[in-house]
Amino acid sequence: MSNKSNDNGRAYEFAFINELGRIATQNQNINIEKNSSYYVVEKSWSTLSDLEKEKYTKSAIAGINLITSLEPIIEDGNGVLNLKIQADNKGELGDIRDILIQRENINWEIGLSLKHNHFAVKHSRLSHKIDFSEKWFQLPSSQNYWDNILPIFEKLEIYKKDKIKWRELSNKEDCIYYPILKSFIAEIKEKYDKYNSIVPQRMVEYLLGYFDFYKIISQDNKKLTSIQSFNLRGTLNKPSKKRKADIFIPVANLPTRIIDIDFKPNSKNTVELYLDKGWQFSFRIHNASTIIEPSLKFDIKLIGVPATIICLETPWEE
């Protein structure tokens, strides 16, 4: 993502945590942890115009109204309600939640992953130095995979030294994207043939993290806030002592089988993955810089989810 997109995402986190603190303050004690990550998102918020701040606030309020209907402990619990912005590097460690909401006295915690005008799941990379199979599945990549991709990335290393720009490569899809993705597909198939259900399960855990969460997406052009539940371990949607949630969130199961993985029709830079239980992903590979570098970035999206992933939308109040 661009620096502007990153700043917008951080500003949205600031709007959300502060509006949540304001709304939830009624009849209870709130603690917003002022850690280094909080000051980073506050700085991004300060770069917005007044009109942008108004939009972000409206989106946050709409999302908060939905979250409190799904999680009654936010408003009904005893003790201090702690709110915390997580550091960006948590995602590399398997925790993609941006905001944590906690009640330490009852050992309760939920997490939110916030997106501003985009639906990407993750932006992983492929390179000659990254063992994606080890990172995704905890299974080292095969020698065949390295033998196929290393010559391509060595060529990119030479282009980098010559300061050649990506736009100057007229055949990058045929000579770079397609063969790298072909090796990527072959490696996943090889691992699945050998290790079966471990591969799809660990892939989804890598992409979505090891903690349950709600994904909250601000769609500014539609003036909508969307929420998706990722309740893979049954930790979301708990009742408070006073009431149950307004909407029931079922537990979603991890996949156990790869149905198919192949190139998207008529594409040389996008792979589609179909798993059982309704999970579907797309992996679009692209360059993320002007000058060629020996590293390529994925734009990974969920294009299909199980019926147990609840998707809700709410319009902003004018």
Curated annotation (Swiss-Prot):
Enzyme class: hydrolase
Alphabetic keyword roster: Endonuclease, Hydrolase, Nuclease, Restriction system
InterPro entries: Restrct_endonuc_II_HaeIII (IPR019059)
Substrates-to-products reaction catalysed: Endonucleolytic cleavage of DNA to give specific double-stranded fragments with terminal 5'-phosphates
GO biological process, one term: DNA restriction-modification system
EC number(s) on file: 3.1.21.4
UniProt KW Hydrolase keyword: yes
Domain of life: Bacteria
GO molecular function: type II site-specific deoxyribonuclease activity
Protein name as it appears in the record: Type II restriction enzyme HaeIII
